[in-house]
């Protein structure tokens, strides 16, 4: 593994690494891996392929991605969806995504906070993908009832859905369940796709038009690691989220969870 670019951005140190043997590229920010992909920009992260597979089921054609990283999901969706919009606070992410991860220049990119972008826009989407992190945490304001209601107001009323990536360190980490609980204040249909028993995993919280969604399959295999991705997708399962959280004041905009 070699470092092919290193820079200090407003949001911390960024490193782009390359595996010489397999021609794989990795985007690391402040010590956390944000993206990993093959030379064609196809992601090596199973949760990205899960999101891609779920979007295919709802035939989403107009999609907003909040959070760019290396932009591998945008690269993959750019080949199929009619309109992709990506929002990220870090302008360097877009340059890196285009230079190393194959993000098409035709994809609309905005340097902005996801919530502020939605407040300034009247557009409604088929799907909104939330994959934004400060270090290893979802930004606090994106973990609120007000934020979810804002997202809901920008989704197509009949087919729109939210898909959110929520990191879990282990089975006792309640972050995915907390996120689902807060989301349920804005949507009637909220589901959780997870892999129990895996340390340091990505769970997906789904809300909106998600009742008919099935477990996703690998649709766009990368040049390597396809079997590993398929194995992890096969282990994913929808599970009941633990609804034992109470909001102190759901209308306040804060997370306000009583655990």
Residue ranges and their predicted role:
Residues 2-18, 34-38, 53-56, 198-259:
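SAM/dcSAM-binding transferase cores
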Residues 32-46:
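N-terminal cap/recognition module
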